[in-house]
A protein has these predicted regions:
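Rossmann-like S-adenosyl-L-methionine
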Residues: 161-417
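Class I Rossmann-like S-adenosyl-L-methionine
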Residues: 1-194, 293
Length: 417
């Protein structure tokens, strides 16, 4: 049985996450630093409870009959084996028996779509309109499941089979990912960062779908490549490895802190073909000086992140300014396009589910940039020996179909003249 203080802790943390604007993992780290007397098992209970509540918040609020965080936590516990009596023994003052009865008689198939899918109203309206209700529900249910742990093998240092074997020797067997030719997968969370394989730079943790974005660019040795929104550099590192540590990859980002986090990863990887470039905005002089000189540009644009809800379930409960996001995406794509030389390639990608951030951005771009034309994703994937077919020119990945995070990517070629 959970200690009374743990229910209170979980409720406090849940409330701070859903009412704040700081990512759940950072808030959780901060909370545990402020409560150092909490043991490992207790921290595990609180973290698992809070993430469970974030994933299926609408369901637990339905059972609780309201949105009080402590009631939400209680409903979660009732759905995970606790009895009303056990809750009452923790000092819980809510209607434990009424909630337990609602749990016992619950028929999820009769619930409103938003509750079944555990989505906020704005997403519960958009996704059925975009995908149709059955597909939207399957997608939402998959997004509410924890993601597996995917690894990308650093092919500059080792082959996939070698890393798989060495991880097994260290007690962490993995399976090859079905699509990425350099991916490995664990279904559970284990301390992989403590392995000698990780310390030696043989792999990075990276979702399989994210690995496919770099393949869409098809960078070659000795080329000049730009990762326009590099962040902490997961795709930058992959691009550098795909180029066999030759040529140059420029990692652009507006956040110095994110680029700083890339530096130890670069050192561990053994790559020396990556250059980090801090920029103030997409029109920065450091961007302009490369205009028309770059062979390939990847734009993994800042987005709503709605495709990453398996890992970041708190995102869906925050308000987003979609017009501001899409305006920014349009400006970034236009600026990045200016870098591409004739015959070069531009890949626009997001981890968003929303058409407004994906197809609409590309369609608007092509309407004013006839010098670019789409390259079918299926052709690229076939060349890279990825066993995936796509219904149209875009790469579209979804957790209920591919067991990856949701990604969108469109490859565009600049005409020679």
């Amino acid at each position: 049985m959970a200690k009374p203080i743990l229910l209170k802790s979980a409720a406090e943390l849940l409330e701070s996450i859903v009412t704040g604007n700081i990512p759940a993992d950072r808030q959780m780290d901060s909370y545990f630093r402020a409560h150092r007397n909490m043991g490992v098992r207790d921290r595990g209970f609180v973290a698992e409870t809070v993430y469970g509540c974030l994933r299926e918040r609408r369901l637990y609020e339905h059972i609780a009959g309201g949105s009080l965080p402590l009631d939400t936590v209680a409903a979660y516990l009732l759905m995970h084996g606790y009895s009303a009596r056990a809750l009452e023994e923790t000092g819980f003052k809510g209607d434990a028996r009424g909630m337990a009865e609602r749990t016992r008689t619950l028929d999820k198939n009769t619930l409103p779509f938003a509750v079944q899918a555990n989505l906020p109203d704005w997403l519960a309206e958009r996704l059925p309109a975009q995908f149709g209700e059955p597909e939207a529900l399957a997608l939402a249910l998959a997004l509410n499941q924890p993601a597996p742990v995917d690894l990308r093998v650093n092919t500059v240092k080792a082959k996939r089979e070698e890393v798989q074997s060495r991880l097994a020797e260290e007690g962490f067997p993995c399976q090859p990912t079905p699509y990425s030719p350099v991916g490995l997968r664990r279904e559970d969370r284990v301390p992989l960062f403590q392995t000698q394989c990780f310390k030696n730079g043989l792999f990075e943790v990276q979702d399989e779908g994210s690995q496919l974005l770099s393949l869409m660019l098809e960078p070659k040795r000795q080329e000049m490549v730009v990762d326009f929104c590099a962040g902490a550099g997961g795709k930058t590192l992959h691009l550098g490895a795909l180029m066999a540590n030759a040529g140059t990859v420029y990692a652009f980002d507006v956040s110095v802190k994110r680029l700083e986090r890339l530096k130890p990863r670069l050192k561990r990887s053994g790559l020396n073909n990556v250059r980090t470039v801090s920029i103030s905005h997409e029109r920065d002089a450091r961007v302009q000086r490369l205009k028309g000189k770059i062979d390939r540009v990847l734009v993994d644009a800042p987005c709503s992140g709605t495709g990453t809800l398996r890992r970041n379930p708190d995102i869906k409960w925050r308000a987003i300014d979609l017009p501001e996001l899409t305006g920014n995406q349009q400006r970034i794509l236009a600026a990045a396009a200016g870098l591409v030389k004739p015959g070069g390639r531009l890949v626009y990608a997001t981890c968003s589910l929303l058409r407004e951030e994906n197809d609409d951005i590309v369609e608007n771009f092509l309407a004013v940039h006839p010098e670019f034309s789409p390259i079918p994703a299926g052709e690229i994937l076939a060349r890279r020996h990825v066993p995936l077919t796509m219904a149209d020119a875009a790469l579209r990945l979804y957790p209920h179909r591919h067991r990856t995070d949701s990604f969108y990517a469109m490859a565009l070629e600049r005409k020679q003249s």
